[in-house]
């Protein structure tokens, strides 16, 4: 019987996409998980560890965000197939690795500043604060998925195509992207309340 070395096995996401991609934003490097996995499903093993979700593959975090609200709640296989088809569409439209396009979209749509409420003497003040890198990734993923769901709601366009278009638009820093518009809105409000 042959023995296999772990380093010789070439794992790719969905059996197609390599996870060796470049992250340009140094603050997000620790929080975008790019370890190679064939099936992005960890079963919530990160849940009880602090910053455990930072080690989760970024594709699984996208799948979990697609699965989260409303009628897709708990249907991970449906969310898995949505993301898999969206990645195929991204590869066809851009000719690039969809994981690289996703990482670029996250970097572009992650807000750097936001507003928090501070109550002082019974008066509420809104103060601009820097956003933690973990929250930046969370907000970027949430806004990408919200934009895709908004684009496909009451529309014949399927969610897979809407998600692919949203990721491509955010990766190219296109203001038509919901995630980019949301980021600019958050940063504009923070700028006005400095």
UniProtKB/Swiss-Prot annotation:
A Pfam short name: Ribosomal_S7
Family, as annotated: Belongs to the universal ribosomal protein uS7 family.
Gene Ontology terms: cellular component: small ribosomal subunit
Gene name for this UniProt entry: rps7
Its job: One of the primary rRNA binding proteins, it binds directly to 16S rRNA where it nucleates assembly of the head domain of the 30S subunit. Is located at the subunit interface close to the decoding center.
Subunit structure: Part of the 30S ribosomal subunit.
Statement: the UniProt record of this protein carries the keyword RNA-binding: yes
UniProt record, GO biological process: translation
Protein name: Small ribosomal subunit protein uS7
Keywords: Ribonucleoprotein, Ribosomal protein, RNA-binding, rRNA-binding
Entry superkingdom: Archaea
GO molecular function, one term: structural constituent of ribosome
